[in-house]
C-alpha cells in the first residue's frame, strides 16, 4: 500500500482490501467499540486504537499481528448478529464466497465455515448447504477459520427464516 493510500485509510480499510480477505464483511465501528462485544479478547484497548485510527501507523509495531486475530474474533461475533447476518446474506446472494464444486449441486452458492472456533487450527473452508460438504475455496484466501466458526452455516440458515437450505426445498 502506498503512503498516499495510508492517509485516507484505517487499518480496517487496509485489511479488508487485502487480496484473499473478500470473505470478510466490514464490522461497523459502533459494534467494534461496544465493550460487550470485546469481552474475553486480549489487548483490546491497544488494538482498538490501532484499527480505528484514520491513518495506518506502521511505526506502531503491531500491524497485521494481533489486529488480524482481534478483528477476526470480533468478525466471528458480528456475523452472528442481525446486522452481520444481513451483510453476509448479501454476500451469499452475490456469490462472493464461491459455488460448490460438486456437479450435482449445480453451482450452489456456498458460505464460509471454520472447522474450529479456536484461532490457528485451520484456514476457512466453504460449505455447500445442498450437499452439506466443506471444500477448500478457489479464491486465494488464508483467512483463519475461527473468523467464521464451525456453526456459521447452521446459524445463517436458522436465523434467516426467509431462507431455507436447498435440502429443505422439496424441488431438489
Swiss-Prot record:
One of its GO terms (cellular component) is cytoplasm. Probably not expressed in wild-type flies. In males lacking the Y chromosome, it is testis-specific and constitutes the main component of star-shaped crystals. Pfam families: CK_II_beta (PF01214). Coiled coil: none annotated. GO terms for molecular function: protein kinase regulator activity. InterPro entries: Casein_kin_II_reg-sub_N (IPR016149), Casein_kinase_II_beta-like (IPR035991), Casein_kinase_II_reg-sub (IPR000704). Induction: In wild-type flies, it is strongly down-regulated by double-stranded RNA (dsRNA) interference mediated by Su(Ste) transcripts. In males lacking the Y chromosome, the absence of Su(Ste) locus, relieves such down-regulation, explaining why it is strongly expressed. Unknown. In males lacking the Y chromosome, its strong overexpression leads to the appearance of proteinaceous star-shaped crystals in the primary spermatocytes causing meiotic drive, possibly by interfering with normal casein kinase 2 activity. Belongs to the casein kinase 2 subunit beta family. There are multiple copies of the stellate gene in fruit fly, encoding proteins that are extremely similar, which makes their individual characterization difficult. Thus, most experiments probably do not discriminate between the different members. Interacts in vitro with the casein kinase 2 alpha subunit (CkII-alpha). The relevance of such interaction is however unclear in vivo. This is Stellate protein CG33236/CG33240/CG33244/CG33245. It comes from Drosophila melanogaster.
Amino acid at each position: 500500500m502506498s503512503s498516499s493510500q495510508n492517509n485516507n485509510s484505517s487499518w480496517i480499510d487496509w485489511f479488508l482490501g487485502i487480496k484473499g480477505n473478500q470473505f470478510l464483511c466490514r464490522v461497523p465501528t459502533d459494534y467494534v467499540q461496544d465493550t460487550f462485544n470485546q469481552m474475553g479478547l486480549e489487548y483490546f484497548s491497544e488494538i482498538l486504537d490501532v484499527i480505528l485510527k484514520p491513518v495506518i501507523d506502521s511505526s506502531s509495531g503491531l500491524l497485521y499481528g494481533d489486529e488480524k486475530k482481534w478483528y477476526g474474533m470480533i468478525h466471528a461475533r458480528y456475523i452472528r448478529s442481525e446486522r452481520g447476518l444481513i451483510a453476509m446474506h448479501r454476500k451469499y446472494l452475490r456469490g462472493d464466497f464461491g459455488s460448490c464444486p460438486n456437479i450435482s449441486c449445480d453451482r450452489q452458492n456456498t458460505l464460509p465455515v471454520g472447522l474450529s472456533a479456536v484461532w490457528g487450527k485451520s484456514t476457512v473452508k466453504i460449505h455447500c448447504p445442498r450437499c452439506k460438504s466443506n471444500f477448500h475455496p478457489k479464491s486465494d484466501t488464508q483467512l483463519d477459520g475461527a473468523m467464521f466458526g464451525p456453526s456459521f452455516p447452521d446459524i445463517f440458515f436458522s436465523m434467516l427464516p426467509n431462507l431455507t437450505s436447498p435440502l429443505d426445498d422439496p424441488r431438489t
